[in-house]
């Protein structure tokens, strides 16, 4: 209400918005416990500028296929309904859609451990994930197969993850701190067929220790340095087509998307599964 006062710790990220359709001015007052003057905080005059509400036809968004919003006469949302969720697939309906309509839009700014900067657009993400989907398919990976990803913060994680989303294989992200017995348990419990692993540290060593006791494991892919007995992900996946078409059998809605293992604090880790609608809620 007009005249209300709110005290808060400004070191915590925050924001303020006006609702109800009326113009509003916010006054921010910094309370300085030392009592000393702060020249940078001299009173400044603020002239509010009226913002014009844009209609859906002026600024269409990919969300309109999935969400209906009712608003009041002042443009304030009053009701939200979701639709078509049974068909939703994040890789096709968000990543690829933006890749087609806004190809140069930045999807991710990645800074590697050696300070190499990569600016990855949605067009890049669309094409590289398609290459991954085609690559994985060539290895015999299919819809419903389980694939473990131990990739730390490598940018290849996102190419592989979205490629698996398109293919319909179930991604199982895992920590690079797992030891051989942890890996063996997860592979056998989830019947994992493929593992994509970083060459950093001793992760691949731990996988190789576990592999002989894991009959379901067929493919081992390494990201980074080459390793005997492993397929070279960085070298092989770029050879494949950057186009991957959606089909009537492509994963969607209630199909499985992800599996995570719990921490196992009170017993053996358990599988928590998520469907494609999970990413829709984000």
Predicted ranges, named:
Residues 104-162, 179-184, 235-238:
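Conserved AMP-binding/adenylate-forming core of the ANL superfamily
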Residues 54-58, 138, 162, 166-235:
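Structural core segment of the AMP-binding/adenylate-forming
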Residues 2-9:
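Short acidic-glycine-tyrosine-enriched beta hairpin
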Residues 118-123, 257-281:
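Conserved AMP-binding A3 loop
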Residues 103-106, 222-231, 238-261, 268:
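Conserved pre-ATP/AMP-binding loop-to-beta segment of ANL
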Residues 53-68, 84-108, 127:
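A short N-terminal helical cap/helix-turn-helix that marks the beginning
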Residues 10-36:
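Ligand-binding loop in jelly-roll beta-barrel domains
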Residues 71, 94-121, 225-228:
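AMP-dependent adenylate-forming
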């Amino acid at each position: 209400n007009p005249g209300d006062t709110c005290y808060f710790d400004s070191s915590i990220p925050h924001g303020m918005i006006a609702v109800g359709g009326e113009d509003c001015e916010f006054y921010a007052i910094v309370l300085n416990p030392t009592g000393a003057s702060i020249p940078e905080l001299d009173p400044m005059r603020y002239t509010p500028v009226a913002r014009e509400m844009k209609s859906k036809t002026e600024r269409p968004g990919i969300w309109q296929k999935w969400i209906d919003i009712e608003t009041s006469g002042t443009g304030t949302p009053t009701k939200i309904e979701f639709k078509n969720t049974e068909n939703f697939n994040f890789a096709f309906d968000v990543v690829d859609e933006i890749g087609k309509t806004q190809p140069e839009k930045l999807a991710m700014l990645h800074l590697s451990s050696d300070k190499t900067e990569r600016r990855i657009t949605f067009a890049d993400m669309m094409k590289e994930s398609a290459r991954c989907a085609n690559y994985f398919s060539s290895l015999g990976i299919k819809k419903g197969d389980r694939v473990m990803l131990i990739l730390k913060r490598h940018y290849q994680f996102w190419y592989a993850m979205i490629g698996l989303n398109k293919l319909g294989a179930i991604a199982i992200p895992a920590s690079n701190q797992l030891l051989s017995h942890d890996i063996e348990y997860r592979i056998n419990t989830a019947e994992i067929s493929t593992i994509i692993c970083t060459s950093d540290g001793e992760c691949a060593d731990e996988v190789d220790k576990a592999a002989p006791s894991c009959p379901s494991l067929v493919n081992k892919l390494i990201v980074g340095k080459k390793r005997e007995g492993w397929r070279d992900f960085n070298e092989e996946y770029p050879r494949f087509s950057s186009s991957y078409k959606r089909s009537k059998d492509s994963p969607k809605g209630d199909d499985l998307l992800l599996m995570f293992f719990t921490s196992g604090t009170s017993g053996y880790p358990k599988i928590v599964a998520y469907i494609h609608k999970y990413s829709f809620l984000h």
